Amino acid sequence: MSGKTSIAVLGGGSWGTALAHLLAHAGHSVALLLRDTAQAAHINAHHENPRYLRGVPLHPGIRAVAGDTGGPEQAEVLAGVSILVLSVPCQAMRGTLRRLAGVVPPDCVLVNTAKGIEVSELVTVERMVREELPGFVDRYAVLSGPSFALEVATCKPTAVVLGCRDERLGARLREVFATPWFRSYSSTDVPGVELGGAIKNVIAIAAGLSDGLGFGLNARAALVTRGLAETSRLGVALGARASTFMGLSGLGDLMLTCSGDLSRNRQVGLRLGSGESLEGIASSMCMVAEGVKTTQAVHRLAQRLGVDMPVTGTMYSVLYEGFAPREAVQALMGRQLKEE
């Protein structure tokens, strides 16, 4: 896997496009697999993805290929790849994996970039791979951390974590993704890396909600800090290491997503706090805010495991039970006093 590697990135959204751009800059042979024929043609002709990264020039070495996932056009590409980067939304991942069965080469490495928990089964992507593509569990990795797609695509310095249970594979993947502006660390704590990336989206909606209501920086800092605490509690209950949540895929991603205006989940919270309805917000966004569905999954997991997650529970009440945003934040502040 050293030197030039044949890589396919599945998903032509902002993150998939940014990673294809990054990997092409790193000297690899990169195919970007997407469904829209016109979008693929535009990328190949103009080296730009106008729907998701308008105005950002893409590396000319990217080859965009349109077609159905697992269909003949993409199957031809997948037959020769060493790494497949999965950049599709978490809630669509299981169906995607099923369509890839029998298409992906048996020695291919899967690198997941989705940040979420499946609502129907309450599992992360690693578990989905174990169930749908069991032969690839030992060659599975997850890339997560504070990384807005636009900044990666415009070569801004970025550091992330590659979670991989195989230390040697994790070390090789660090090299594959390395560029002068993109640095990867590796971790064997796959559950921690996946859960940190997923749950921070829930907390980001809460932080945006607080900001949209005009509650100020003190309130945001409190939400972020207490949100990190409950993220760690659930993570440990699910087998993750507490220390992982103090790293890039935990605290780092949480800080960025709760404060950066490029965060889709923060934007959902801001708009809710400003009085918009969730339905109106969702219909106006061309990109997925994973935190809305993840809130439901995390809340149900916390209830199942008996883990105290008041920020998540409050956001569930706002998003799914009609709890007024201002009263929701005030209810958090009015909880019984206790030790930290």
Task: Tell me the role of every PLM-derived stretch.
Residues 1-56, 63-67:
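NAD(P)+-binding Rossmann beta1-loop-alpha1 motif at the extreme N-terminus of oxidoreductases
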Residues 54-67, 136-138, 180-182, 307:
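A short helix-to-beta-strand connector/capping loop
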Residues 64-71, 76-157, 173:
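Rossmann-like NAD(P)(H) cofactor-binding subdomain of soluble oxidoreductases
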Residues 92, 103, 128-139, 157-205, ...:
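Internal alpha-helical scaffold of NAD(P)-dependent oxidoreductase catalytic cores
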Residues 112, 138-144, 184-188, 246-247, ...:
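General beta-strand structural signal in soluble alpha/beta enzymes
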Residues 207-211, 236-246, 250-340:
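NAD(P)-dependent Rossmann-like dehydrogenase/reductase catalytic/cofactor-binding core
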